[in-house]
Amino acid sequence: MCLFIETIRIDHGRVCNLSRHNRRLNDTRAHFWPESTPLQLSDYLSSPGCGAGITGAGIVKARVVYGEKGIEDLSYSPYAVRHVHSLALMQTDTIDYTYKSAGREPLNCLFALRGACDDILIVKQGLLTDTSIANIALSDGTHWYTPAHPLLKGTKRAALLEEGILQEKDIRPEDLPSFSTVRLFNAMIDWGELELPVRNITP
């Protein structure tokens, strides 16, 4: 069975970026199952439902698993950012994560090759894309640029582009010396919450 996921940040009871998560869920279902009925995540998510003793955690991760029949599973857990201090460049031209599949085996296999680094930065067809868990942006000291062709067009990325905080750009590994800082972000990692110097990206 083909399953997909949405990972949604709940910040002290506030569901973040819900409209974009909802749009991606329904776009995915329409692509794979054109006859599917649109769903409203708000019908399934509720901040009281995040309870069972974890609402006091502050930041909660809601993990929604869905497929052809609709929502298959919904779980909540306290969330803490996993710190990343180094990235290993990893080349692959075959990986495809256009849709947020519950099956992450290709990403997990690449992640296992990271060596002493904390995470990987995937290079596809000569261009930087994403880490194993996040979109990225690079700063030249004036502007923030995000790869124009990420593996997954994340909901946080879409919001930052719309707000004018990010600009899309084709970025190659050989362009890295032009930048000073790399930021990682996704639905759970806020903008500016996780960054490291570009010199900590290793071939």
Please tell me what each predicted stretch does:
Residues 1-127, 143, 149-203:
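Conserved alpha/beta cores of soluble small-molecule-handling proteins
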Residues 129-135:
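Short beta-strand/strand-turn micro-motif
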Residues 138-139:
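Short beta-strand-to-turn element immediately C-terminal to the catalytic PLP-Schiff-base lysine
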